[in-house]
Amino acid sequence: TVYNPDIIAVHTTCLSETIGDDLTSIISKADEEGLIPEGKKVIYCNTPSYVGSHITGYSNQVTALVKFFSKSTSRRRNVINLINGWMEPSDQREIKRLAKLMEIRTIMFPDMTDSLDTPLTGKYNMYPRGGTTQEDLVATGDSKFSIGIGHDCTENACVKLDEKCHVKYDVVDVPIGLKATDR
């Protein structure tokens, strides 16, 4: 097999939304029929092209991460979730650096700092190292607090995490410029 991911993310398109594809039923049936390989996780969300923009689709998929992974053991950990909006990997890296300087333990998701911002080595790597681990995604439900970075992309995920696991949150602007960075 060429591809062997641990997580398969499925989303709709304008056409599949128009004809009424029911992702919940389709994926449940595939699971019941044994079509999803053992140990693989399939997450999904609706991303209709005619509702909102690419930001809406991104927000829906980030919210799906919470829906399918976050769990609470009722044991709060001294960790802050950093839920990223539409940001460059270099911006994410800087936010992680600042949190580390302040000695704040974080779980950043999605975290594209190492998987999308990699050097050109001349070797093809289908699955670059990095990103948020499944274990960390599950642990977001036990975090002390969440900070959503970018209202349009993260507010729904923050709300979902609070509803599901009672993790309080604040949603802030993307820290571009002095005013937003100081906030």
Question: PLM ranges: what are they?
Answer:
Residues 1-183:
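An N-terminal assembly and electron-transfer interface module characteristic of large anaerobic redox
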